Amino acid sequence: MSASQDSRSRDNGPDGMEPEGVIESNWNEIVDSFDDMNLSESLLRGIYAYGFEKPSAIQQRAILPCIKGYDVIAQAQSGTGKTATFAISILQQIELDLKATQALVLAPTRELAQQIQKVVMALGDYMGASCHACIGGTNVRAEVQKLQMEAPHIIVGTPGRVFDMLNRRYLSPKYIKMFVLDEADEMLSRGFKDQIYDIFQKLNSNTQVVLLSATMPSDVLEVTKKFMRDPIRILVKKEELTLEGIRQFYINVEREEWKLDTLCDLYETLTITQAVIFINTRRKVDWLTEKMHARDFTVSAMHGDMDQKERDVIMREFRSGSSRVLITTDLLARGIDVQQVSLVINYDLPTNRENYIHRIGRGGRFGRKGVTINMVTEEDKRTLRDIETFYNTSIEEMPLNVADLI
C-alpha cells in the first residue's frame, strides 16, 4: 500500500536510492513513547511486560508508518530492536476475530524465524494472536495439519517452506495484508531472490511490504524497485553503523596455523561469560571443535549441516548459559538474540565485509557492552583495513589487559 498507490507503476523504483546504497530518509516523524503510538491496550501491556520502557531509535521512526500501512524500508544495525518494530506493527493491524493468516514474515535462517516467532508471541501475549514458524527441517505433515486446522494470524518462516505451503495452497494468501522481509540483505542475496519473487507473485498486489536490513547493497535496492510502492525510507548512513559499545581489536597471528594456539591462550587469560567464535566454513567448524575438545576445552558448535533438532538443542543450551562458548559459521550471525554474549572472536574474518556487522552485533545488543577480537594473518591485513574503511571505524591492536574490558 502507499500514499499514491494508484498512480504508481511497479517499474518505477524508490527515489533517493543511489547504486551503492547511500540512501536518504524521507520520514522525519519521531514518536518517543509507546503510549503515543495509538496502540491497543493489550499490545501495550505485552510491550511493557516484555521489558521495553522506551522505543529505540528505529522503533520511534518506523512503527507509525508501518501501522499506517505504508511500504517501509528500514535500515538499522543488528541489536536496535528491528524485530519488535515490525512485530508491534503487525500485532496492531491484526484482526483477532478473523481466523486467517494476515501477516507473513520471511527470515533467512530457521533460528532467526524461531526467534521472531518468540518475540511476536511475547509481545502479543495479552492479545491472543497466534503465530506459527513455518520452517524447513520440520515435519511437513504436521505443518500442513497446523495450517489447515488453525490458520494462524501470523506466519514467520524461511522462503523454501513458505513457498511450498503457498504453492500447495495449504497457506492462503487471501487475507495477507502485510509482508515483511527481515535481514533483507541476506534474503535477497542470490540464493533467495528467486524464492522471494515466487512468493510475491502469490500475494495480493496491494499487500503492504516492509523491508528491514542492516546494510543496503545495490542488489537489495534493485529488488525493492520491483515490489515496493513509494516506500517510506528510514535509514542510518553507513558510517553510523559502527556498533556503539563494542570494542574492536585485532591480534596479528601472522600465519593461519598459529590461530589455534592463540585461541587457546585467550581461553586461559580471559574469564569469559559467553563467547561466539565465527569461522567461514562448516568443515572448519568441525575441525576446530575437535581440536579444542582434544585439548580439554569445553565448546559447542553449530552449522547448517546439522539437523534441526540438534541445532535447537545447541541454541537452547547456549541461550540458557549452560554452554558458554559456541563455534559457528555466519548462520548464527543473522539476528539471533543471545543476550549474554560479551565476546565475539572472528577466528576467520568474514569473506563478505557486510557480514562483519552481523557478527559483531552479537556482542552488545541495545547498548550492552561487548568486545570483538579479530584474528588476522598477513594475508588478512588488507581485508581488515577494508572493513575499517567500509564502516568508518577503528580496530586497534588487542591490549594486554583485554580481560578487564569484558
UniProtKB/Swiss-Prot annotation:
Gene Ontology molecular function, alphabetical: ATP binding; ATP hydrolysis activity; RNA binding; RNA helicase activity; translation initiation factor activity
Region of interest (Disordered), ranges: 1-21
Residue intervals of the Helicase C-terminal domain: 245-406
Modified residues (N6-acetyllysine): K118, K174, K193, K238
Phosphothreonine: modified positions: T158
Gene Ontology CC entries for this record: cytoplasmic stress granule; nuclear stress granule; perinuclear region of cytoplasm; plasma membrane
SUPFAM superfamilies from the UniProt entry: P-loop containing nucleoside triphosphate hydrolases
Subcellular location: Cytoplasm, Perinuclear region; Cell membrane; Cytoplasm, Stress granule
Subunit organization: eIF4F is a multi-subunit complex, the composition of which varies with external and internal environmental conditions. It is composed of at least EIF4A, EIF4E and EIF4G1/EIF4G3. Interacts with PAIP1, EIF4E and UPF2. Found in a complex with XPO7, EIF4A1, ARHGAP1, VPS26A, VPS29, VPS35 and SFN. May interact with NOM1. Interacts with PDCD4; this interferes with the interaction between EIF4A and EIF4G. Interacts with RBM4. Interacts with DDX3X in an RNA-independent manner.
Chain's role: ATP-dependent RNA helicase which is a subunit of the eIF4F complex involved in cap recognition and is required for mRNA binding to ribosome. In the current model of translation initiation, eIF4A unwinds RNA secondary structures in the 5'-UTR of mRNAs which is necessary to allow efficient binding of the small ribosomal subunit, and subsequent scanning for the initiator codon. As a result, promotes cell proliferation and growth.
Name of the protein: Eukaryotic initiation factor 4A-I
Taxonomic lineage from the root: Eukaryota, Metazoa, Chordata, Craniata, Vertebrata
Gene name of the encoded protein: EIF4A1
